[in-house]
Regions:
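Rossmann-fold NAD(P)-binding glycine/threonine-rich loop
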Residues: 57-73, 80-121
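A conserved regulatory-domain signal marking ACT and ACT-like small-molecule sensing domains
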Residues: 286, 291-401
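Glycine-rich phosphate/pyrophosphate-binding beta-alpha loops
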Residues: 269-271, 275-281
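Rossmann-like NAD(P)H-binding beta-loop-alpha module
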Residues: 97-178, 185
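N-terminal glycine-/serine-/threonine-rich beta1-alpha1-beta2 phosphate-ribose binding loop
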Residues: 1-73
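Flexible, glycine/charged-enriched surface loops at secondary-structure junctions
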Residues: 10-13, 170-173, 194-202, 224-225, ...
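A short hydrophobic/small-residue beta-strand
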Residues: 76-78, 358
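Substrate-binding/catalytic subdomain of NAD(P)-dependent oxidoreductase enzymes
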Residues: 155-253, 258-260, 279
């Protein structure tokens, strides 16, 4: 599709010469005539006529081996493999730099949204302050359905699997791992730090109930799983967790399986990038964009290319990624407490003792929460900013009530 447009943009023809797939019959049917289909990917890497290898296998295992072999053979690489780059990016980018080849990965983050190019090139003049994004369509679909239909997580997950929005094993999505892979890559590009997935704080949506969605709405918020990375005086925050977003914000109204990324730069202010974060066509759009970039720069000196992580390798920052215990932010608490006098005073006393101030509070009648005759009720508290370590201390005391 759009071959003429692509040729006009690239300035040279780009030809698919070989495809490797264990199911060669399926691959041949998809590739069409004139394309050599093999079962062994190393045959593609070994072909001296091939300039660019596209890796769409996924995972850390054979994909890593093949990417490193392609780089060692002097081939440029295009990949959509966020997990591979988030975990092994430092090794892969160093190998690419050594061998003078490019590794392009627009499709690894937010599918059809060109957020990597925006961060690496479009916002070059800016000092990036923070990034916050809905970067996993599965969890955004689940949270949207929980809000719209008032259903619990487990029920909506099954529906998401039936519709094809969630994998048979959805762990990476619902536990926040997929979003953390993407946030790790954006953080490295935004702040010029090595990829450090092992230092990211990762929390998924499995502990959220329908009542949390309802209470957030009553307080004027919507719950979104956000990937957040932020520059602070002490270091870089890198975290994924459910977040309360004011309902009037544009990003709060990103529904279904769509993605959106907000970027704050000192010159441009807040910018928002929105679109399809997954799917065959959005992914293909990003892969082809990378192919065109490499075709334009094929043969160019390394100094004329955009560095993999936007900053020159010798200029990477040593700013630390902060542990979550040092992050300062506000909190949503849902406490299921005894419906009796004095409990509220104890809770507020614990928070005050930890130096945590309350921004807003809801208290439900016990029969609203557990039905007639219930003796437990929900106490919902929004706090002002405080350090996570203090909140953890306060939570430990409240759990003992």
């Amino acid at each position: 599709r759009n071959q003429e447009e692509i040729f006009r943009r690239a300035g040279r023809s780009i030809e698919i010469a070989m495809v490797a797939d264990l199911d060669t019959t399926r691959a041949q049917a998809a590739a069409g005539p004139g394309v050599t289909v093999v079962a062994d990917a190393r045959a593609v890497i070994a072909n001296p006529e091939i300039d660019i290898i596209i890796e769409l296998i996924g995972g850390y295992g054979i994909a890593k081996q093949l990417v490193l072999e392609a780089i060692a053979a002097g081939k440029h690489v295009v990949t959509a493999n966020k997990a591979l780059l988030a975990v092994h990016g430092t090794e892969i980018f160093a190998a690419a730099h050594k061998h003078g080849v490019m590794v392009a990965f627009e499709a690894a983050v937010a599918g059809g949204i060109p957020i990597i190019k925006a961060l690496r090139e479009g916002l070059t003049a800016n000092r990036i302050e923070w990034i916050a994004g809905i970067i996993n369509g599965t969890t955004n679909f689940i949270l949207s359905e929980m809000r719209d239909k008032g259903l619990d997580f487990d029920v909506v997950l099954k529906e998401a699997q039936r519709l094809g929005y969630a994998e048979a094993d959805p762990t990476f999505d619902i536990e926040g791992v997929d979003a953390a892979h993407k946030a790790t890559l954006m953080s490295a590009i935004a702040f010029g730090i090595p990829v450090q997935f092992d230092k990211a704080y990762v929390e998924g949506i499995t502990k959220l109930g329908a009542q949390d969605i309802k209470y957030a709405e009553q307080l004027g918020y919507r719950i979104k799983l956000l990937g957040i990375t932020k520059r602070t005086a002490k270091g870089i925050e890198l975290r994924v967790h459910p977040s309360l977003v004011p309902a009037k914000r544009l990003i709060a109204n990103v529904e279904g399986a769509m993605n959106a990324v907000m970027v704050q730069g000192d010159a441009v202010g807040t910018t928002l990038y929105y679109g399809k974060g997954a799917g065959s066509e959005p992914t293909a759009s990003a892969v082809i964009a990378d192919l065109v970039d490499i075709a334009r720069l094929h043969g160019a000196e390394a100094a004329q290319r955009v560095p993999h992580l936007a900053f020159q390798p010798q200029s990477m920052s040593d700013m630390p990624v902060l542990p979550m215990s040092e992050v300062v932010t506000s909190y949503y608490l849902r406490l299921n407490v005894a419906d009796e006098a004095g409990v509220l005073a104890k809770v507020t006393g614990i928070l005050a003792g930890a130096g945590i101030s309350i921004d807003a509070m809801l208290q439900r009648e016990a029969d609203e929460v557990g039905g007639e005759g219930a003796t437990q009720t929900d106490l919902i508290i929004l706090t002002h900013d405080c350090v996570e370590a203090k909140m953890n201390e306060a939570m430990a005391q409240m759990q003992a009530l």
